[in-house]
UniProtKB/Swiss-Prot annotation:
One biological process term in Gene Ontology: proteolysis
InterPro entries assigned to the protein according to its UniProt record, in alphabetical order: CAP3 (IPR011952), JAB_dom_prok (IPR028090), MPN (IPR037518)
NCBIfam families: ICE_VC0181
Residue ranges occupied by any MPN domain in the UniProt entry: 5-142
Name of the molecule in the record: Probable metalloprotease y4qB
Keywords for this protein: Hydrolase, Metal-binding, Metalloprotease, Plasmid, Protease, Zinc
Binding site for Zn(2+): 89, 91, 103
A GO molecular-function descriptor: metal ion binding
Assigned protein family: Belongs to the peptidase M67B family.
Bilayer-spanning residue ranges: none
Record flagged with keyword Metal-binding: yes
Pfam family, one: Prok-JAB
Family matches, as PROSITE patterns: MPN
C-alpha cells in the first residue's frame, strides 16, 4: 500500500522560507507527529535547526541540545500524543531527490536509537533552489539482507497538505 505523509501548509511554508534563507547551504529541521496507521504519517509541527546548527554546502547538523529540549516541550504540550517522527533537510542544486549515502546512514542511526522511538522515520528532502524547491518524501526502515546484515530501505511517500 502506498505511503502518505500529511503535513500542515504552514510547516511547508516554514520549510521553504528556511530553505530559501540558506539557499546555498544545507538546512533542515525535525518533525513531530504520529502515525495514524501503518501507511499514513501525520506531521503536526516542525522544529527548525536552532541557532547553533551547522550548515555547509554538503551537510546540515542541528543544534542537538536545543532540538531535544523542543522535542520534549512539544511532546508534553501535545499531551504525549506527538512524538519525534523524522527530519527534513535541503539538497541545494540537487537534481535527484534520492536519499544520499549520508541520509541512509542517518536513517539507520535514527532507527537503531532507542531514544528516538522511530522505527520508520520520515525524511523529506527539498532539492533545487530558491525558485524551485521540490519536495521528495521517504520512509526509512531496516530490512534483513542476509542472516547477519541489515540495510536501510527507503520507500517513496506522497505528500499531502492540510490547513491548521
Amino acid at each position: 500500500m502506498p505511503k502518505l505523509i500529511w503535513i500542515p501548509e504552514s510547516v511547508v511554508e516554514a520549510m521553504l522560507k528556511d530553505a530559501s534563507r540558506w539557499h546555498d547551504l544545507e538546512t533542515g529541521g525535525t518533525f513531530m507527529g504520529y502515525w495514524s496507521d501503518a501507511n499514513v504519517a501525520v506531521i503536526t509541527k516542525m522544529i527548525d535547526g536552532g541557532s547553533e546548527a551547522i550548515r555547509t554546502r554538503k551537510s546540515f547538523s542541528p543544534d542537538r541540545e536545543w532540538e531535544q529540549s523542543e522535542i520534549d516541550r512539544h511532546y508534553r504540550v501535545s499531551g504525549r500524543v506527538d512524538t519525534y517522527i523524522g527530519d527534513w533537510h535541503t539538497h541545494p542544486n540537487a537534481q535527484s531527490g534520492e536519499p544520499s549515502w549520508t541520509d541512509r546512514r542517518c536513517l539507520r542511526t535514527i532507527i537503531r536509537s532507542p531514544e528516538a522511538r522511530a522505527p520508520r522515520p520520515v525524511m523529506i528532502l527539498l532539492c533545487g533552489g530558491p525558485e524551485n524547491w521540490l519536495p521528495h518524501a521517504w520512509i526509512g526502515q531496516l530490512t534483513r539482507r542476509a542472516l547477519l546484515f541489515e540495510r536501510v530501505e527507503t520507500t517513496a511517500a506522497t505528500i499531502s497538505t492540510y490547513k491548521t
